[in-house]
């Protein structure tokens, strides 16, 4: 008989594909949380080093990278995506705060480059992309979450098994918050096209 045959199942409406009573995971959009503690300031024009801030004893403390209002500052991080990643574009949302009652906006942008085994790490990033600048609420230390960015094309011809380096920065030419923006982390969205990483 035939081998390697696909099975196509199409849930109706808002129905969920299940095996017995358990939902079956379907390839598609996925999320990675990258906290500020997994990032590092760049040597040139870097943001401030990782800081910990207590707001009230016994309540959530902040681990943040602080970005000035006066000039563009940068940080980096890296991700080895799962094999099921489709090697396509990615998007992100930034999570941040500021110790100010200012209602100004903050603009975050991200660029990436994929490096293969035996490839040169000393390689330029692709074009930086970011969401619309996000305004603060006017209450000090409120959480601010940006909209999802546009598609970020990763330089370096991404392929399975590569490491992707990312460069994130505050674009002060596109914002007007007159205080440090405290980056807490980002949600990084990517797309899978396989059921697992086998």
Which role does the model predict for each range below?
Residues 1-2, 6-12, 16-21, 25-28, ...:
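Beta-strand-rich, repetitive solenoid scaffolds
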Residues 169-198:
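Proprotein-processing/basic-patch segments
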Residues 68-84, 89:
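Short beta-strands within extracellular/lumenal beta-sheet-rich domains
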Residues 157-172:
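Noncatalytic modules at the cell exterior or secretory-pathway interfaces
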Residues 102-110, 180-183:
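Short coil-to-beta strand junction motifs in C2/discoidin
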Residues 22-70:
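N-terminal leader/pro-regions and domain N-caps
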Residues 120-157:
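Extracellular carbohydrate recognition and processing domains
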Residues 88-98, 106, 186:
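A short beta-strand element within beta-rich, extracytoplasmic domains
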């Amino acid at each position: 008989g035939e081998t390697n045959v696909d099975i196509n199942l199409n849930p109706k409406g808002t129905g969920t594909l299940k095996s017995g009573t358990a939902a079956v995971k379907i390839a598609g959009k996925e999320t990675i949380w990258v906290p500020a503690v997994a990032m590092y300031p760049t040597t040139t024009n870097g943001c401030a080093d990782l800081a910990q801030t207590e707001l009230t004893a016994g309540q959530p403390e902040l681990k943040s990278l602080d970005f000035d209002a006066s000039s563009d500052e940068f940080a980096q991080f890296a991700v080895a995506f799962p094999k099921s990643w489709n090697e396509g574009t990615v998007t992100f949302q930034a999570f941040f705060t500021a110790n100010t009652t200012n209602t100004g906006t903050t603009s975050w942008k991200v660029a990436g480059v994929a490096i293969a085994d035996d490839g040169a790490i000393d390689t330029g990033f692709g074009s930086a992309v970011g969401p619309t600048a996000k305004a603060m609420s006017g209450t000090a230390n409120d959480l601010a979450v940006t909209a999802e960015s546009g598609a970020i094309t990763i330089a370096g011809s991404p392929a399975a098994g590569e490491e992707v380096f990312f460069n994130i920065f505050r674009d002060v030419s596109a914002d007007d918050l007159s205080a440090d923006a405290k980056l807490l982390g980002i949600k990084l969205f990517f797309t899978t096209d396989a059921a697992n990483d086998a």
